[in-house]
């Protein structure tokens, strides 16, 4: 997480808002451990050449394929996306994370996520052209449920995922319709799901930026504070925090399989080209 304190003027009142790119929003590995000592008698010298801090050299090498981890890229991106914040409506920025959004069709998408005093901002950012292309704004006082747990799929699903995620749900009176659930391009689904970035923990400089636990802790704190200061009708009980399976209703999952295997939701090099 990056801690920021900055803001820019603008206006808006929708609990959830989708902004397209260009829309006006207002003015303006070293060694370590025992491997670092001198080799003992009869010990092959080459054993001391492997730094113990590198548990997965292949994964560490792959981090270079992601544009976001190139020197100065994440710093520039964070600096630029501050302009999407509406100080009157959103308040100050509390933190920024680099996470992976998993949509209702199990597609992975690289996202910059901001938590402000009053809003959750989900930014689609192109780390190649260094442009913010889209922003989804969710009012924190509209969040009714935050769930954390392992992913769950229908028994006969052909494309499942392992691991843990966090799901943020809002507008409990408007659960996804049948059409929204089965439309892979729907933007009206009233929840979002995040997992850690696939390269989380590889780059020590950005490790805290990708931590899901830190994001969850600050999100819960920010939602409770926003609901206490600006409660909505029907939210008297506060946000519901659950530890439970996160259901993704995909069966064949061919589209998400292709998307996730090829990492199409990430800005990264692909052979001699990058997209």
Swiss-Prot record:
Signal sequence, renumbered to the chain: none
Residues bearing the modification Phosphothreonine: 43
Cellular component terms (Gene Ontology): calyx of Held; cytoplasm; presynaptic active zone; synaptic vesicle; synaptic vesicle membrane
Chain coiled-coil ranges: none
Location of region: Important for homomultimer formation: 189-275
The record's account of how the chain is modified after translation: Phosphorylated. Phosphorylation promotes association with synaptic vesicle membranes.
Main location: membrane
An individual GO BP term: regulation of synaptic transmission, glutamatergic
Region described as Disordered: 21-42
Bias-annotated ranges (Gly residues): 25-40
Domain of life: Eukaryota
Bilayer topology term: Peripheral membrane protein
Localization: Cytoplasmic vesicle, Secretory vesicle, Synaptic vesicle membrane; Presynaptic active zone
Keywords: Cell projection, Cytoplasmic vesicle, Membrane, Phosphoprotein, Synapse
Domain hSac2 residue range list: 68-240
A Pfam family: hSac2
Record region (Important for homomultimer formation and localization to presynaptic regions): 61-100
InterPro entries assigned: hSac2 (IPR034753), Inositol_phosphatase (IPR022158), TPRG1-like (IPR040242)
Chain positions with Phosphoserine modification: 10, 14
Family: Belongs to the TPRG1 family.
Function of the molecule: Presynaptic protein involved in the synaptic transmission tuning. Regulates synaptic release probability by decreasing the calcium sensitivity of release.
Subunit structure and binding partners: Forms homomultimers. Multimerization appears to be important for presynaptic targeting. Interacts with BSN.
Protein name: Tumor protein p63-regulated gene 1-like protein
Organism, scientific name: Bos taurus (Bovine)
Lineage: Eukaryota, Metazoa, Chordata, Craniata, Vertebrata
């Amino acid at each position: 997480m990056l801690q920021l304190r900055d803001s820019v003027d603008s206006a808006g009142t929708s609990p959830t808002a989708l902004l397209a790119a260009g829309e006006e929003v207002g003015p303006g590995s070293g060694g370590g451990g025992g491997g670092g000592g001198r080799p003992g008698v009869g010990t092959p010298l080459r054993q001391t050449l492997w730094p113990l801090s590198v548990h997965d050299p292949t994964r560490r090498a792959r981090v270079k394929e992601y544009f976001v981890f190139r020197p100065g890229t994440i710093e520039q991106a964070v600096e630029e996306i501050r302009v999407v914040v509406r100080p009157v409506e959103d308040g100050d920025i509390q933190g920024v994370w680099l996470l992976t959004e998993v949509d209702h069709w199990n597609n992975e998408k690289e996202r910059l996520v901001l938590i402000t005093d009053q809003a959750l901002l989900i930014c689609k950012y192109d780390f190649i052209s260094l442009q913010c292309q889209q922003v989804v704004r969710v009012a924190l006082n509209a969040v009714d449920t935050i769930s954390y747990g392992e992913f769950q799929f229908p028994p006969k699903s052909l494309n499942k995922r392992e691991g843990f995620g966090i799901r943020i749900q809002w507008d409990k009176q408007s659960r996804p319709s049948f059409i929204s659930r089965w439309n892979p391009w729907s933007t009206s689904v009233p929840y979002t799901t995040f997992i850690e970035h696939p390269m989380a923990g590889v780059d020590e400089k950005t490790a805290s930026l990708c931590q899901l636990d830190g994001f969850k802790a600050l999100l819960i704190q920010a939602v409770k504070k926003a609901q206490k200061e600006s409660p909505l009708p029907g939210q008297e009980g506060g946000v519901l925090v659950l530890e439970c399976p996160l259901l993704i209703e995909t069966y064949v999952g061919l589209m998400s399989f292709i998307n996730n295997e090829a990492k199409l939701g990430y800005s990264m090099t692909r052979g001699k080209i990058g997209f």
